[in-house]
Amino acid sequence: MFVYRLELTLHEKVFFASREIDELFQTEPVLGNYALTYALGLAVTPYRLSEREDRPYYREDFSILNDAGIYVTPGTPLGAPALEVERFNGMVESYWYKMANNAVVSDLAVRLDNARAPATNFPQKGRLRMLSRGNRFACYVFAREALMLPRYIRLGKFLGKTHVAVTHEWRDPPTHTARAVQVDAFLNPLDLSAETQLGYYDFFNLPPVPLIRNAQLSGPVYALGDVHLPVGMGFGFPPLETPTRGRGRRRAS
């Protein structure tokens, strides 16, 4: 088993809609492990979904990685995260326009023939709260075989450039059975093995799956320096129609 500790440094602003409140689209200071897996090139999927592919294919993409023994943890911020807010306005400048299917329509055919505009879900104006340049995050990559990881990746809706540095590498790190050990890093509760028992934790309800942090857990763990991470993590899959729920006692964050 190879374990890599990656330090990610943002060279450009990074935005993804963790939470939407009216016209404010917020980026939470955490990098989801699904997004990191795609960005690192470990799973490959088209950037845009076609009309036939109207849902993400997490199960199909990540089942291959589970079979290969590859797993990526969420990215935890190092230090206090820096955020900034920018305003955007995509309203048209034509004399006539109207709202239709959550989009601004200025097409003359729509105006004259009352044709139905294609449905869309792109906001026309609002504010974006983004991660600033210089933010740093740490994540861990597990693999049965050695991996060649890229030095630069693209993250977020606008594909912000991010530097990747492997700061530590372990081969067959030591493990032990812990009881009520504190894990400060972000974890995906769907990815924990059945041998890992959760106590309390901070819960973050983020799409596509919730994450937890500051968790107290018991079970087999890797000893990676002064960091402990659960043994046996693998990609779990959220149900398509029902909400996901974490295990254990939830503590307000």
Q: Can you say where each PLM-predicted feature lies in the sequence?
A:
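Short amphipathic
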Residues: 2-12
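Short N-terminal binding/cap micro-motifs at the start of the first secondary-structure element
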Residues: 14-20
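Short acidic, gly/pro-rich beta-turn/loop elements at beta-sheet edges
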Residues: 18, 50, 149-151
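Short linear interaction motifs
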Residues: 20-22, 112-124, 241-244, 251-252
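Short, polar loop/linker segments at the starts of domains and inter-domain junctions
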Residues: 22-28
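Basic polyanion-binding and macromolecular-assembly surfaces
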Residues: 129, 134-253
